[in-house]
Amino acid sequence: MTSRTATEEPLPAASPRYQQLQARLGVGWNTWDVHSVTTQVLLPDGLAIHVGLKHNSTLYGDAFLGDALIGRLTPGAEQVFPGPHAWEGGYTDLRLSWKGHDLRLQTAHDGANVVMLATPLPSQPLSALPATIVFSVNYLWGRPGSVVKEARRIEARSPLHTVAVYCTCKKAPERALAEDVNLPVSDAYFSTDFVQPVGVSSGAPLSIERIEAIIERARQNYAQSVARSGKSAEVVDAIQTVLGWDTIYEPEGRRVLSPVSRVWSVSWGGYVIFDWDTFFAATMASIGDRDLAYADAIETLRSETQQGFVPNYARSGGWKSSDRSEPPVGAITVLGIYQRFHDRWFLEEAFTPLLRWNRWWAAHRDIQGYLTWGSDGTNAPANLDDTARGTRAGAILESGLDNSPMYDDAAYDAATHKLEFADVGLMSMYIADCDALATMADILGEPAAAKEIRERSARYRVKLETLWNSDAGIFLNKDLRTGQFSLRLSPTNFYPLLAKAATPQQAEVMIKNHLLNPKEFWGEWIIPSIARNDPAFKDQNYWRGRIWGPMNYLVYLGLRNYDQPEVSRQFAEKSYDLFLQEWKKNGHVHENYNGLTGTGDDVQSSDRFYHWGALLGYIQYLNETEPLPSPTAVR
């Protein structure tokens, strides 16, 4: 048995400036607890108010719901329909359905305090008895504090604050003893039959009418703030909402960040940072919360391995994929955020780890001057439960495209730990990464680094040009064993547009003959992760034909580099139409979508609240708010 401490990797020390940022983020009431969207937590104390629901019966079948997550798919699980979630948690709203009970839970800030309002909704109860709603209070994460229930309040005392919690709960005398004895709650709590609205307040006892008024004021403030975005209001609401619900406090690192969905994070022990997923969360957060955008980008970089690369994943316990990385989108993310806010310290914080990562690709993933994916199982420390490390499967996972048909025939060289497969997408993303990083070096006054990076970019740009196939009219991946081009097309074949590596003439051919070709990529729902005429498209299984926000986003950024305003506009609008379909219907932000029907609910392998699905809306936000750049930089 391997000891825990033998292989866990601690986080690097944070700079004073970044510590200050985290201190600003990690304060006040919000849905900080990864385990439940119905829990309100006060930071930095760690004081939590949990909402529980007990299903009662006169026969058998009693059950208790102590936590709730968006998108849980196990049989009989609660169904959560997320509503607005302000960046700082000043207003939240959700609906929950479980065992025939339906409720609405709203919260709002009242100065430094919080109010919570639970309202029963019309439903089809499964028993003769009403549900019992429970509000319990404790301290999370081993934080010091004591909680005492008194006659009319629960008082919580920590070294930082003393907080009194009150409830409008009213219990019938004949029900009180049974409720107190039989609820499966070990902490101090309030409980009542859930037959009318119930309110909870911290700081002072408030009437239900006063709580409702505070909630309504917060709701109006949220609506007004979103409305100020004009025609982009709907997408701003969606991005703010998905990132609001997906942002948590991570107690191991004492940090606020936006890992992927809570369902994923819980199953990975409390949190999981995937490289490009969390970089893209940072990009989207930049439309409304600068500190959160910085935190998501910096925390992704702080997860780097001993070898100097950002791993495929970094999870609870300090475990990482030391064998493999993921797509190099860090520099374009950081530079894009910098260009919104122009905070030099942010570039200074990010530049050194980005440069290490950029150098690592060239040193460890180069075959014959081409970049390819890989997985080196000899890297330490080894994650022993990760059976993909040092295998062909691990090398494909480095692409982020776990089961893409592009790699069905790609060979893995166990001696070099690499796929023998020149990858158009990787080379294009890497060149774009180099160009963004060189610009950062210019801003920071690092001429030697800028020269080094541009030389590397130029070298790989020359090699990428050799992957242009004039017969196919597109850049093609290449089997480095046989020298044969692969005719299996995915959105990554358009990534040379992102790197400005295609000539205007090549871009025109690629767009006309392939992107706008309904037999390949165009259609009502765009764009599939493999061409529609590929045999694997019919699988509609993960990266085998489904539509993914990050692919659309990178292709759209590429289109913006060329004089294709109408195609860019249509691409953005079609992406947004796809996103809105289930956002409006169910409040879902899907991990991926069916390439034929545009739905995400048709399979279990599409998380219902995965923030990068909102990139489909972010594309439209860019289309509406940022003018297309001049294409003159493209040769």
Give the predicted meaning of each segment:
Residues 243-251, 289-309, 350-369, 456-474, ...:
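Long, well-ordered core segments of solenoidal/helical folds
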Residues 8-48, 321, 326-341, 469-514, ...:
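C-terminal capping/lid segments that line or modulate ligand- or cofactor-binding pockets
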Residues 229-335, 339-340, 347, 355, ...:
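Substrate-binding groove/exosite segments of carbohydrate-active enzymes
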Residues 254-259, 524-531, 587-591, 632-634:
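Short coil/turn segments at secondary-structure boundaries
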Residues 1-232, 269, 561, 599, ...:
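Terminal accessory carbohydrate-recognition/targeting modules of carbohydrate-active enzymes
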Residues 345, 349, 448, 452, ...:
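Alpha-helix N-cap and coil->helix boundary residues
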Residues 181-203, 307, 311-329, 335-345, ...:
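The feature captures the catalytic groove of carbohydrate-active enzymes
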